[in-house]
């Protein structure tokens, strides 16, 4: 499985990778830490899943979701965030995110990834 991970914080990036590995998910991860790197990655390869921080210093998660929908509309997108309010969570799901996971509750990431991939496969088969 090829994942594009948009995360500017190295420690969080490593924690997300470790969590995915501990969940038994075998994946190749491409990292992006800025809008430019994310955009270039979207243009250079096809991904099975995109995971993005909701809040980045110079780029919003919603903008990243929008960009991914334009270039890879069928790729599931999951937000991770330290804090995400109810309004932001609803906005992200309405905008096309498959799910969101709080960084303090990363034990739910594996389940969110599996569900997002399963739902994307079901949509593709229709």
Question: What annotation goes with each model-predicted range?
Answer:
Residues 37:
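Short acidic active-site motifs
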Residues 2, 8-25, 32, 40-125:
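N-terminal membrane insertion elements
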